[in-house]
């Protein structure tokens, strides 16, 4: 199987998000990279499912709470941006202040 650099990046992101999910299920709080991976994966999968950019901008803020992440992570994470593939093309999705 040959993957382009873009596909390799998406696969790595997906794996990081899965690891973050498992850690969260075990009751661990997430660090910055894990939080970004989980939110980004939510956005990419939502786009793949046909949800709109507006829907994802709202739901992206509901993925994690302050209780889910290590101290200081919400303050470090101002925006999460990803180019997601929607049924009608690729669009940039931005979630401002994703951890409330």
UniProtKB/Swiss-Prot annotation:
Cytoplasm in keyword set: yes
Pfam families in the cross-refs: Urease_gamma
GO biological process: urea catabolic process
Pathway: Nitrogen metabolism; urea degradation; CO(2) and NH(3) from urea (urease route): step 1/1
Any GO CC annotation of this UniProt entry: cytoplasm
Record's subcellular location: Cytoplasm
An MF annotation (GO) of this entry: urease activity
Substrates-to-products reaction catalysed: urea + 2 H2O + H(+) = hydrogencarbonate + 2 NH4(+)
Alphabetized InterPro entries for the sequence: Urease_gamma, Urease_gamma/gamma-beta_su, Urease_gamma_sf, Urease_subunit
SUPFAM superfamilies hit by this protein: Urease, gamma-subunit
UniProt KW Hydrolase keyword: yes
EC number in record: 3.5.1.5
Keywords, ordered alphabetically: Cytoplasm, Hydrolase
UniProt-listed PANTHER family: UREASE
Membership in a protein family: Belongs to the urease gamma subunit family.
Oligomeric and partner information: Heterotrimer of UreA (gamma), UreB (beta) and UreC (alpha) subunits. Three heterotrimers associate to form the active enzyme.
Protein name stated in the entry: Urease subunit gamma
Organism: Rhodococcus opacus (strain B4)
Lineage: Bacteria, Bacillati, Actinomycetota, Actinomycetes, Mycobacteriales
Annotated gene: ureA
């Amino acid at each position: 199987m040959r993957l382009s650099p873009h596909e390799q990046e998406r696969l790595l992101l997906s794996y990081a998000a899965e690891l973050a999910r498992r850690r969260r299920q075990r009751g661990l709080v997430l660090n910055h990279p894990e939080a970004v991976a989980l939110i980004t994966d939510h956005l990419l999968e939502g786009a793949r499912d046909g949800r709109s950019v507006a829907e994802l901008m709202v739901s992206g803020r509901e993925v994690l709470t302050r209780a889910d992440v290590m101290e200081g992570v919400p303050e470090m994470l101002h925006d999460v941006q990803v180019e997601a593939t929607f049924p009608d093309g690729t669009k940039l999705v931005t979630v401002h202040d994703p951890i409330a």
